[in-house]
Amino acid sequence: GRSIMKTKIIKTLLIQTLLAVIVGFLVSIVANLFIEGARYFLSFQTASSALSVRFVDVDINLIPTVAMLISAFLIVLVRRSLGVTKWSGPADSIYALHQQKVGVDVRLGLGSTLAAFISASGGASVGQYGPLVHFGSTLSTMLSRLLGLQINRDVLLACGVAAAISAGFNAPIA
């Protein structure tokens, strides 16, 4: 009796710890790709004046406008191809915590994170950490479903949130 209970508790803690490490590792990679990728694409807007127009003694760079139009097209493409009916974010992660179903809608989470990346890369004033926090909980949901794990929902949300925040601020551990 008691020995079996201890073994079950230890097994559960090990699984939760392993999931936390995996999520932390993957979210840190995605967070850095998100931030550096957006910076990379934004650098093209200021580095080039190929679409510069002179109007009333003022040079107007049209690259930011073109970048936003391309971003808008790509976001519509993401929305249609993934069937996203509404964008999701950290509030949806918190809401999912209070529901019977474990985790967030993976399709909406991935679509929302991709749309936020496209928006930030195109120059929109989109926060970086909100989408990354939601991606962390989306990834936690994906892994727990893929592995068939029944883990505590508080741990599920905390793994994603802590991983995204620590990675976003280049902290080694949350």
Segments predicted by a language model, with ranges:
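Alpha-helical transmembrane segments and immediately membrane-proximal extracytoplasmic
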Residues: G1-A174
